């Protein structure tokens, strides 16, 4: 297994990724999460989670592992979500090609930067986005949002991350 990890994980970004497209550099590492559904409603729910990011494949990609609830809080393995995203920089398109998978789900996204936000647009439903904002060395904010047909913005869930 060590050879697999050594071949997968990279310590540095590839020179093929321009600095201005290295959107994930401040997320590399491990994070504690406050996952929030129904923010500001009577059904508001908070779950503690964890999120880990690493450079992969000679620095050409970024992979994460999203675990919610956190491993220390899980009652059984079917509870919550345990998934991974693989992001590969596409120099021809100057964007990130991405896939997220977890049990019974596989979603593809395109990652770009818009107005200081890292926006991951679902390629099968362009009204749905995953958005990273307020990324710093110690914290970040993420939300799953959809432009609804009636013109409103629906925020399905949010994550507030703090570095471990």
Locate the predicted segments by residue.
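Hydrophobic small-molecule pocket/channel-lining residues, especially in calycin-type beta-barrels
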Residues: 1-164
């Amino acid at each position: 297994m060590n050879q697999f990890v050594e071949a997968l994980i990279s310590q540095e970004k590839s020179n093929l990724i321009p600095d201005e497209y290295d959107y994930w550099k401040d997320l590399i590492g491990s994070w504690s999460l406050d996952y929030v559904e129904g923010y500001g409603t009577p059904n508001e729910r908070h779950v503690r989670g964890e999120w880990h990011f690493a450079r992969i494949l000679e620095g050409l990609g970024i992979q994460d592992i999203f675990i919610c609830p956190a491993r220390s809080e899980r009652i059984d393995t079917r509870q919550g979500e345990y998934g991974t995203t693989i992001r590969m920089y596409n120099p021809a398109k100057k964007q990130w090609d991405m896939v997220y998978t977890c049990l019974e789900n596989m979603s593809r996204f395109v990652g770009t930067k818009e107005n200081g936000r890292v926006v991951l647009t679902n390629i099968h439903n362009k009204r749905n986005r995953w958005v990273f904002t307020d990324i710093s060395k110690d914290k970040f904010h993420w939300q799953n949002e959809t432009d609804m047909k009636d013109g409103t913005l629906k925020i399905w869930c949010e994550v507030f991350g703090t570095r471990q």
